[in-house]
Amino acid sequence: KKVYGDDLKAVYDKSSGTAPFKAGLELVDGYMYKKEGFSDDEQVVLENGHKFIVNWTEGQKTGFFLDQRENRALVGSLSKGRNVLNLFCYTGGFSIYALASGALHVDSVDSSKKAMMMVDRNVALNGFDPSLHTSLCCDAIDYLKNVPEGKYDLMIVDPPAFAKHRGSLKNA
């Protein structure tokens, strides 16, 4: 609160599902701080001029992966004039940057219907021509197996963690 002052609207702790079990911490997801009048519903966040709908409570982890900010910017810098494939797209962060940077077309692929609806909403929120983007709700690996050679100039492959720790590596 000292850093953001009145601009701080909420602090939501969502570490119960991500903190190592061995840490022995009793973690409960919830608000650590919430400004009066702050809605629990979706919020729009702004990153480098791009808007993203985020649901802190319902989304995966935080609902938006802040640690990928530099990678999204890198994808943007490589996307102009290219056909882009974003596999495991979740809410479409890489897709938005590619579109904003002048990609010819972006295909976003994820197996989650909910995630694909969010990608479409984020594309609309940022005012992109919907004909430049296609959302494909299917298994990303199966899709990749059937992609014709040369269809894409740039591919983003950012899968979820299949194994969170060494003990579950065999099952992953």
Regions found by a protein language model. Give the residues of each.
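Non-catalytic substrate-recognition/targeting regions of SAM-dependent transferases
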Residues: 2-64
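Local beta-strand N-terminus motif with an aromatic residue
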Residues: 8, 81, 151-153
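Conserved alpha-helix/loop element of class I SAM-dependent methyltransferases that forms part
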Residues: 66-82
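Conserved class I S-adenosyl-L-methionine
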Residues: 81-90
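Conserved SAM-binding loop of SAM-dependent methyltransferases across substrates and taxa
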Residues: 91-104
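S-adenosyl-L-methionine
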Residues: 114-156
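Mobile active-site "lid"/loop adjacent to the S-adenosyl-L-methionine
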Residues: 154-172
